[in-house]
Amino acid sequence: GKLFSEVTDTIKILQSRGIEIYIASGDRKGAINKLAEILNVNKKHAFGTVSPKGKCKVVRCLKDRGYKVMMVGDGLNDVLAFNNADVSVLTVEQEEEVSPKLINKTDYVIQKISEVISIDF
């Protein structure tokens, strides 16, 4: 995947608010570990080569531990996780055509990743 330009600052702001960041991606584990390092995200919270069902499992496990979960994603492969999160956010920053079906499955649609900062959940 592509790293959005504002993601580093966005992650820092969220972390400063005490929000724990988890990454679940279909990308290679090595790439996700590197991303976690760049973003200063705990590597134990970074999961690579994750299927759509796997993303859903991550969301469910976090909720089972008492976390309130905001799922941010950008594609149809995120729908299962969106459906299980407390708040689902679709980012359309990737500039690909987005399915109306996908838009209808989310609580929020954002143009820039930094917009998650203003979502109260």
Residue ranges and their predicted role:
Residues 1-20:
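Short, acidic loop-to-helix structural element flanking the phosphoryl-transfer center
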Residues 3-6, 29-33, 97-98:
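Cytosolic catalytic headpiece of P-type ATPases
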Residues 13, 35, 61, 80-81, ...:
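Hydrophobic/aromatic ligand-binding patch that stacks against planar heteroaromatic rings
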Residues 16-20, 62-69, 86-87:
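Short beta-strand/loop segments at the ligand-binding rim of alpha/beta enzyme cores
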Residues 25-29, 68-108:
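Acidic, Mg2+-coordinating phosphoryl-transfer loop and its flanking beta/alpha structural elements
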Residues 29-68:
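Substrate-recognition "cap/lid" segment bordering the active-site pocket of phosphatases
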Residues 44-50, 107-115:
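Short acidic-hydrophobic, aromatic-tinged amphipathic segments that line or gate anion-handling sites
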Residues 53-59, 98-106, 119-121:
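Short, charged, surface-exposed secondary-structure boundary motifs
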